């Protein structure tokens, strides 16, 4: 059966630059790699075709020969009986430079895996987030075995060199004229085997444990902030470095304040007499109570800014402000005397609309009148 064109295999044009070829190779290699398609013979065959095409088309001399003579350039007797370019190719160079970053391949022994990072969600009150706090947390994790100290081998013994790869962590497989290096299936790339495993960790070098940590939360953090504790994640495999622990901050809803950036907001209810005449009222801050002066004729929704009464950001800079939004309350539970006084007040305003004393009401009702006048014209 005729071999498929190398350019068609990679899906590139015959004028494609090397970077286009590498890009196409990475995409296809990830799709058809045996590690992702275990037991799929068609994918394995396709992967071999992709590797072969890549090796030829990224070698300037081989590509020129292929462009001139096609597949015959690499067959015995090709190019006038010179034997083409077969036999001596070492595909491990390609894996090391291009493919190793995807699947961990390449030459040399595979390094023991770094420990996994861990995440802990920490809920804080607003006061804790603003002032800072130290909290103890308990984390289920994998820690280095204290008996074998991460080696996985029983005391008095040690890991032995893998007889399959002789400690290299890689084995060489010949595929046609290619010599391809792959991770040793016997030792999984470590280059060593544990013949006499530790009784506590059973050769894993790590044990399950729940550890207690004291975490210092800096002042000014907010929901979404993340604190990294280096080396407090899971222990690495066979002595490799530990991962990190990330503490994710979530600030609980507060009964009085809402936070927006470095500013705090709160609603301050006042009665309608204070709104009309003015006065002073106590308002809460995170540092205690302070007096807020309310000027006469204050309307619902008016904001009063108290500078420096907000939050100082964990990232530095000026402290935020506290913004108090006034809500004018309608009186309830009135007695007869109070109702009579309000009626007299209403009459003094000139009726329910009180146009002289309620500029917004006058503007509203003037607009309503114009609307209906326009409808009847």
From Swiss-Prot:
Its main location: cytoplasm. Disulfide bonds: none annotated. CXXCXGXG motif repeats lie at residues 145-152, 162-169, 184-191, 198-205. GO terms for biological process: chaperone cofactor-dependent protein refolding; DNA replication; protein refolding; response to heat. GO terms for cellular component: cytoplasm. It is found in: Cytoplasm. Coiled coil: none annotated. Zn(2+) 2 binds at residues 162, 165, 184, 187. InterPro entries: DnaJ, DnaJ_C, DnaJ_domain, DnaJ_domain_CS, HSP40/DnaJ_pept-bd, HSP_DnaJ_Cys-rich_dom, HSP_DnaJ_Cys-rich_dom_sf, J_dom_sf. Keywords: Chaperone, Cytoplasm, DNA replication, Metal-binding, Repeat, Stress response, Zinc, Zinc-finger. SUPFAM superfamilies: Chaperone J-domain, DnaJ/Hsp40 cysteine-rich domain, HSP40/DnaJ peptide-binding domain. Transmembrane segments: none annotated. Pfam families: DnaJ (PF00226), DnaJ_C (PF01556), DnaJ_CXXCXGXG (PF00684). Homodimer. Participates actively in the response to hyperosmotic and heat shock by preventing the aggregation of stress-denatured proteins and by disaggregating proteins, also in an autonomous, DnaK-independent fashion. Unfolded proteins bind initially to DnaJ; upon interaction with the DnaJ-bound protein, DnaK hydrolyzes its bound ATP, resulting in the formation of a stable complex. GrpE releases ADP from DnaK; ATP binding to DnaK triggers the release of the substrate protein, thus completing the reaction cycle. The J domain is necessary and sufficient to stimulate DnaK ATPase activity. Zinc center 1 plays an important role in the autonomous, DnaK-independent chaperone activity of DnaJ. Zinc center 2 is essential for interaction with DnaK and for DnaJ activity. This is Chaperone protein DnaJ. It comes from Klebsiella pneumoniae subsp. pneumoniae (strain ATCC 700721 / MGH 78578). The gene is dnaJ.
